[in-house]
């Protein structure tokens, strides 16, 4: 009855380094603005001084997808806008995450017709769904914190977790 010396162990320097990288990524998110409808007004309100996104490490909204790592899709996506959304998503560098903000981005909302995509998850993988029409700035901050926790604890591979 000897000890099994061939146990698989994570190398000492790799595990803490991976945790450090995930912590750094989660605390320095740079969102790309993709506001399409009334949810964009609430997204702009969240970026204002009253809610202070800087304390969460997200004060910089980027206009270029090459400089951002989080895409917040705020509002309905039409058939004509779908290729633009996919192009912007493809231009973002890895790792990248997506938040579907509002009912229209999550499931099409009240626009159940041929012209509106019934959920952006048909176009790009979504990490966090944010319900509401439009969701309040506090809800967007909660969704961003949920995304931070997914990144920090290594859950970012599980796309599509609902946020209610």
From Swiss-Prot:
- Pfam families to which the protein is assigned, alphabetical: Oxidored_q6
What is catalysed by this protein?
a quinone + NADH + 5 H(+)(in) = a quinol + NAD(+) + 4 H(+)(out)
Task: Provide the E.C. number(s) assigned to this enzyme.
Answer: 7.1.1.-
| Compartments, record wording | Cell inner membrane
Q: Which UniProt keywords apply?
A: 4Fe-4S, Cell inner membrane, Cell membrane, Iron, Iron-sulfur, Membrane, Metal-binding, NAD, Quinone, Translocase, Transport, Ubiquinone
Q: From what organism does this protein derive?
A: Protochlamydia amoebophila (strain UWE25)
Give the UniProt record's GO annotations in the biological process aspect.
aerobic respiration; electron transport coupled proton transport
**One Gene Ontology term, aspect cellular component:** respiratory chain complex I
- The gene name on file is nuoB
Which family does the UniProt entry place this protein in?
Belongs to the complex I 20 kDa subunit family.
Q: What is its main location?
A: membrane
Cofactor binding, per record:
Binds 1 [4Fe-4S] cluster.
Origin, by domain of life? Bacteria
Ranges in coiled-coil conformation:
none
* Assembly and binders: NDH-1 is composed of 14 different subunits. Subunits NuoB, C, D, E, F, and G constitute the peripheral sector of the complex.
Name assigned to this protein: NADH-quinone oxidoreductase subunit B
One MF term in the entry's GO annotations: iron ion binding
In this chain, [4Fe-4S] cluster is annotated as bound at: 38-39, 104, 133
């Amino acid at each position: 009855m000897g000890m099994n010396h061939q146990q698989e162990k994570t190398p000492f320097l790799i595990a803490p380094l991976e945790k450090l990288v995930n912590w750094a990524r989660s605390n320095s998110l740079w969102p790309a603005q993709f506001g399409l409808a009334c949810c964009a007004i609430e997204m702009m309100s969240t970026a204002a001084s009253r809610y202070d996104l800087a304390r969460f490490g997200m004060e910089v909204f980027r206009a270029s997808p090459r400089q951002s790592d989080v895409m917040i899709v705020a509002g309905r996506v039409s058939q004509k806008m779908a290729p633009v959304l996919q192009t912007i998503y493809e231009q973002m560098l890895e790792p990248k995450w997506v938040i579907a903000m509002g009912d229209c981005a999550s499931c099409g909302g009240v626009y159940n017709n041929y012209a509106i995509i019934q959920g952006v998850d048909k176009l790009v993988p979504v990490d966090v769904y944010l319900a509401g029409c439009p969701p309040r700035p506090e809800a967007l901050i909660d969704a961003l914190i949920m995304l931070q926790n997914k990144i920090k604890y290594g859950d970012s591979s599980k796309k599509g977790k609902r946020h209610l």
